[in-house]
Design a protein with these regions (language model features):
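Bacterial N-terminal signal peptides that target proteins for export
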Residues: 1-7
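Hydrophobic h-region of N-terminal signal peptides that target proteins for export
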Residues: 12-19
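Extreme N-terminal starter segment of soluble prokaryotic enzymes
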Residues: 22-25
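Conserved SGNH/GDSL esterase-like catalytic core that processes O-acyl groups on lipids
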Residues: 36-124
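Alpha-helical cap/lid subdomain in secreted, periplasmic
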Residues: 93-219, 232
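Conserved catalytic region of serine esterases and O-acyltransferases that act on ester linkages
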Residues: 214-217, 221-223, 227-276
């Protein structure tokens, strides 16, 4: 990875942004979709605008709300705790979720549903209890619990779970968004990180090229899109002026991802504020 050349205007913007630099500690309680979103490019994107992130990912592949809750209650050591500090990643196997939660005074902790269930409202029945237990364990009294709104599968997906949505990307996308809109207010989660909306908007401009397999994001373009979304959400700074991107993403694609990210942030705010 490298940072692209900066114009005088870009340098002026960076100086201005640097005056408002932030240090933010964020923990994702997730699965492979949080791995796609926070473990690649996010730290570098924030650093490019003068911000510092401590990033944690409580990882179990395919983990659902119910399994996270059960793990928290029983103390199972099923997690890989991936942590990025100063741009360096560590991976601690056989970790407990309660230990991960108290590892740092996290400013933001995100929750998410396993992708097959992400658009199924009945699968959210234990979200309130999970949120309560996480919040009680958190050592930062001002921690904010947020939701990671994930993406629909590519239209060509052969995943068996896709059949629950009629093997339709549009149907799955709408189900994910509508489920978040209906279920999150019930448990007091007010804000979403709209990775799934960014991915869907990017598909409109770039085609259905955001995935590397039947469900996961592509290693460069897709993961970059999710990381841009997290960066703008966490820092509150427009991604449009960010000067970092992976070498294997073209300048045109960067512009489209930036546009999709910025639009997704506005769109999710309207969705969450709309009458239910």
């Amino acid at each position: 990875m490298k940072r692209k050349g900066l114009t005088i205007l870009s340098l002026m913007l960076l100086v201005s942004i640097g005056l408002r630099a932030k240090t933010i500690k964020v923990l994702a309680i997730g699965n492979s979709f949080s791995e796609d979103a926070v473990e690649n490019y996010l730290y570098e994107l924030a650093a490019a605008q003068g911000d510092s992130l401590v990033i944690g990912n409580a990882y179990i592949g395919g983990c659902s709300i119910d399994r996270h809750l059960d793990n928290l209650k029983t103390g199972k050591t099923d997690y890989a705790f991936r942590k990025i500090v100063g741009g360096k990643k560590t991976d601690t196997k056989k970790s407990r979720l309660d230990s991960i939660i108290v590892n740092e005074p996290w400013d933001i902790i995100s929750l998410q549903q396993a992708s097959p269930l992400s658009g199924q409202p009945d699968s959210y029945k234990n979200l309130g209890e999970l949120k309560r237990m996480v919040q009680e364990l958190a050592t930062n009294p001002n921690v904010e619990i947020v939701w990671h709104l994930t993406w629909a599968y590519p239209q060509k997906s052969r995943s068996g779970a896709f059949k629950s949505y009629g093997s339709s990307q549009e149907t799955m996308y709408k189900a994910i968004v509508n489920t978040a809109k209906e279920e999150l207010p019930k448990v007091g989660i007010e804000r979403c990180i709209p990775s799934g909306i960014t991915v869907q908007l990017a598909r409109e401009d770039l085609g259905d090229c955001m995935n590397r397999d039947d469900i996961h994001l592509s290693l460069s373009l897709g993961r970059f899109a999710a990381a841009c979304t997290w960066c703008e959400f966490l820092t509150g700074k427009s991604i449009l002026y960010n000067t970092y991107w992976p070498d294997d993403v073209s300048g045109f694609d960067v512009k489209m991802i930036h546009k999709a990210t910025h639009k997704a942030m506005k769109k999710v705010n309207k969705i969450m504020k709309a009458p239910h």
